[in-house]
Curated annotation (Swiss-Prot):
Gene behind the chain: psmb1-A
Organism: Carassius auratus
Taxonomic lineage from the root: Eukaryota, Metazoa, Chordata, Craniata, Vertebrata
GO annotations of cellular component type: cytoplasm; nucleus; proteasome core complex; proteasome core complex, beta-subunit complex
InterPro entries: Ntn_hydrolases_N, Proteasome_bsu_CS, Proteasome_sua/b, Proteasome_suB-type
Annotated localization: Cytoplasm; Nucleus
PROSITE patterns: PROTEASOME_BETA_1, PROTEASOME_BETA_2
Protein name: Proteasome subunit beta type-1-A
Annotated family: Belongs to the peptidase T1B family.
Main subcellular location of this protein, as a coarse class: cytoplasm
Keywords: Cytoplasm, Nucleus, Proteasome
Length: 238
């Protein structure tokens, strides 16, 4: 073992380092793996979209890792943050949904899934899952619904929501194009499914130009009463 000269005193012995206080040992179980998720609710449909890049720092671990997970025939969840927690959380949700279906002989509604997820996250509030969740689906009346969460369980129903590394770029665009925020003398026409899909493609293409953690491909889950349809759109890969 090589010992530097600075570590030895004048007598050739190792220096004795004394600490003036307690030594704090660092424990950092989390990592940020990037990625962006987005959900939009319409009159009779909902969209949940995400990019497929899984990265950490300047390294790309995978170019084919979507962050949209199908829960039921009318509900999809988008998760971004620490990928390990995303996988663990979605497995817990899927297990709870199977137990519910076996007990009640029916699938859980989107609103009930959102309430259940809130209790799961709050139960881990002292050691939370590092995951930002957005649920998109149809409610009991067949209308589109979006539920957004923070990591410890607070949630609310929205018409549109973006989360993840590029959310600060996507949310203002959604506010302008869907919410018509701070706009005067503008006719607020209902959002059609075709326009919503095109808007999602446009905002992700713009985000991939500016956010290094977003890119490779875009996966869009289109939820209607007929079921869930998926579209894949290529994004820039650098």
């Amino acid at each position: 073992m090589m010992i530097s000269a600075q570590a030895c005193g004048a007598n050739g012995r190792m220096k004795d380092y004394h600490y003036t206080g307690p030594v704090e040992h660092k424990f950092s179980p989390y990592a940020f793996n990037g990625g962006t998720v987005l959900a939009v609710a319409g009159e009779d449909f909902a969209l949940v979209a995400s990019d497929t890049r899984l990265s950490e720092g300047y390294s790309i671990h995978s170019r084919d890792s979507p962050k949209c997970y199908k829960l039921t025939d009318t509900t999809v969840i988008g998760c971004s943050g620490f990928h390990g927690d995303c996988l663990t959380l979605t497995k817990i949700i899927e297990a709870r949904l199977k137990m519910y279906k076996h007990s009640n002989n029916k699938s859980m509604t989107s609103g009930a899934i959102a309430a259940m997820l809130s209790t799961i996250l709050y139960g881990r509030r002292f050691f939370p899952y590092y995951v930002y969740n957005i649920i998109g689906g149809l409610d009991e009346e067949g209308r589109g619904a979006v539920y957004s969460f923070d990591p410890v369980g607070s949630y609310q129903r929205d018409t549109y929501k973006a989360g993840g590394s590029a959310s600060a770029m996507l949310q203002p665009l959604l506010d302008n194009q869907i919410g018509f925020k701070n706009m005067e003398n503008v006719e607020q026409v209902p959002l059609s499914q075709e326009k919503a899909v095109q808007l999602v493609k446009d905002v992700f293409i713009s985000a991939a130009e500016r956010d290094v953690y977003t890119g490779d491909a875009l996966k869009i889950c289109i939820i209607t009463k007929e079921g869930i349809r998926e579209e894949i759109v290529p994004l820039r890969k650098d």
